[in-house]
């Protein structure tokens, strides 16, 4: 038998109390996918739950440690925020602007903050920060979906597809930001990369161009007196050109520190001279909560060989092919230096550059693209120590749930290569046919690999998301 308690207060559960749902002692052997049978849940609300069981001798266990789920937006009317973007990026102008705009807003938190949540979608991809700290450890979010009707489908004869599909959708993410806020003045910032939304593919054409970047953000601040205050994206936000002056999934990323605005993502900046963000058209896609794994740094690799070449550059071998990037940490630079990382890969290898604005130390890695490489050549600095460089493997955070080992070293090596290759091909909620060239989710490759992936990784939610994309992308 089992008993489930659901409450709005974690501490109440520790006392065996439930203000939402108490299943009572329920006789049965169910242990998986037991349906919630309490009252209808509310949007943007936290629910705590716990469970205890009885064994065959009717001996009861202790209550499990409480766990939490947070509900998202149950209807479009729950969104108070607006889609906004940069005033200088005009969707009617087809030429590609590959820069990454940045936005900010200051707000006040009063006494008695209990909990704060952020619901956010930034297209193509976003990096959110509060009071100088990055929100979450995700990359390449939100995942790729059919955001909206693609203009190129109406005009490009090489793509014989109907522009309408059955279910456009756009994913939003939710973050607990309580510990990032303090009483008084706070600041939130959004940096937008182009991702798959505003993309020039290999040669900067606009075949995949849905429009310029835009975002929607709604923060809910809950107080001990029961009040809820909202901080939302609207035209009161300020905008600027970010130091990410070039952001392209296929062609790389360039960061120019001369465009940094000190204190941009912290309270107290005088931004009165900056222009305001503008309203942008919302994608046709329904805003839907992200339910799949996001991309994260999965592994950090130290060099297995490190060599200074005759031309003064540094050739580094990290021991295996990964999808990710090289991270430079604490490198001594001079004003005007341009640090370059050439991730040795098949075309398109992609640019990776950092322009230095002053003398000092620099720590840097890309944000809105990945590279496929084992070796890299690093240049632009006078000296580089092996301790100042690592490679970070980045991919969808699907946990391995099976292992393989046998007496044949060749078979073991093949399995390791396959496992790494599969992880390298899982980005932004889809599985690609190759992570370095096309970077697109061809279903033929995905269907063949899926049984093997599901046997080796906890990837059910990953494929649920992707197959949902496929289902919704059919013509009516």
Where are the language model's segments positioned?
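Extracellular/oxidizing-compartment recognition motifs
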Residues: 1-46, 50-436, 444-445, 461-466, ...
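HEAT/HEAT-like alpha-solenoid repeats
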Residues: 471-475
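Well-ordered alpha-helical scaffold segments within catalytic/enzyme domains
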Residues: 448-459
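Active-site lumenal/periplasmic loops and adjacent helix-entry segments of GT-C-fold
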Residues: 439
């Amino acid at each position: 038998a089992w008993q489930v308690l659901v409450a709005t207060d974690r501490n109440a559960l520790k006392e065996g109390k439930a203000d939402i749902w108490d299943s009572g002692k329920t006789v049965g052997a169910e242990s998986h996918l037991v349906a919630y049978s309490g009252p209808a849940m509310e949007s943007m609300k936290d629910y705590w739950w716990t469970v205890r069981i009885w064994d065959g001798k009717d001996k009861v266990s202790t209550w499990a440690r409480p766990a939490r789920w947070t509900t998202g937006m149950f209807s479009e009317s729950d969104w108070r925020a607006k889609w906004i973007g940069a005033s200088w990026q005009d969707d009617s102008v087809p030429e590609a602007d590959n820069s990454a705009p940045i936005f900010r807003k200051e707000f006040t938190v009063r006494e008695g903050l209990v909990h704060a949540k952020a619901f956010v979608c930034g297209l193509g991809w976003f990096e959110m920060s509060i009071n100088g700290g990055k929100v979450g450890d995700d990359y390449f979010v939100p995942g790729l979906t059919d955001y909206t009707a693609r203009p190129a489908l109406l005009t490009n004869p090489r793509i014989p597809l109907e522009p309408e599909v059955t279910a456009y959708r756009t994913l939003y993410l939710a973050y607990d930001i309580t510990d990032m806020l303090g009483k008084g003045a706070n600041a939130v910032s959004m940096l937008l990369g182009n991702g798959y939304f505003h993309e020039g593919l290999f040669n900067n054409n606009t075949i995949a161009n849905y429009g310029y970047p835009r975002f929607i953000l709604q923060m809910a601040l809950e107080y001990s007196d029961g009040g809820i205050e909202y901080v939302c994206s609207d035209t009161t936000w300020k905008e600027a050109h970010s130091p990410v002056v070039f952001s392209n999934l296929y062609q790389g990323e360039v960061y120019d520190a001369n465009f940094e605005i000190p204190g941009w993502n912290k309270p107290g900046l005088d931004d009165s001279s900056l222009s305001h963000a503008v309203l942008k058209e919302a994608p046709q896609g329904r805003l839907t909560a992200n339910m799949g794994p996001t991309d994260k740094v999965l592994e950090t690799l130290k060099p297995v060989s490190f060599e200074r070449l005759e031309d003064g550059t540094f050739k580094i071998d990290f021991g295996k092919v990964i999808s990710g990037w090289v991270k430079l940490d604490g490198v001594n630079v001079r004003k005007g230096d341009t640090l370059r990382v050439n991730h040795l890969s098949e075309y398109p290898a992609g640019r990776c550059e950092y322009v230095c604005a002053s003398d000092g130390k620099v720590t840097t890695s890309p944000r809105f693209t990945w590279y496929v490489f084992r070796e890299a050549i690093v240049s632009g600095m006078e000296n580089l120590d092996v301790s100042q460089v690592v490679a970070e493997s980045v991919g969808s955070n699907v946990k391995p749930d099976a292992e393989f080992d046998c007496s044949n070293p060749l078979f073991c090596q093949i399995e390791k290569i396959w496992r790494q290759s599969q992880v390298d091909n899982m980005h932004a909620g889809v599985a690609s046919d190759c992570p370095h060239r096309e970077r697109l989710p061809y279903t033929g490759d995905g269907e063949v690999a899926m049984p093997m992936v599901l046997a080796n990784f906890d990837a059910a939610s990953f494929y649920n998301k992707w197959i949902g994309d496929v289902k919704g992308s059919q013509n009516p």
